[in-house]
Amino acid sequence: NAAAEIFRIAAVMNGLTLVGVAIGFVLLRIEATVEE
């Protein structure tokens, strides 16, 4: 089913984006802590 495939890909992309944002936020917090 093409619609199901598109929905699955969209969900994966959304998940990767959220993971990327979370990793970036953690790295920023670590950098701020180290600088102090």
From Swiss-Prot:
It is a single-pass membrane protein. Residues 29-36 are stromal. Keywords: Chloroplast, Electron transport, Membrane, Photosynthesis, Plastid, Thylakoid, Transmembrane, Transmembrane helix, Transport. Residues 1-5 are lumenal. It holds the Pfam family PetM. GO terms for cellular component: chloroplast thylakoid membrane; cytochrome b6f complex. The chain crosses the membrane at residues 6-28. The keyword Transmembrane applies. InterPro entries: Cytochrome_b6-f_sub7, PetM_cyt_b6/f_cplx_su7. Disulfide bonds: none annotated. GO terms for biological process: photosynthesis. It is found in: Plastid, Chloroplast thylakoid membrane. Component of the cytochrome b6-f complex, which mediates electron transfer between photosystem II (PSII) and photosystem I (PSI), cyclic electron flow around PSI, and state transitions. The 4 large subunits of the cytochrome b6-f complex are cytochrome b6, subunit IV (17 kDa polypeptide, PetD), cytochrome f and the Rieske protein, while the 4 small subunits are PetG, PetL, PetM and PetN. The complex functions as a dimer. Belongs to the PetM family. This is Cytochrome b6-f complex subunit 7. The gene is petM.
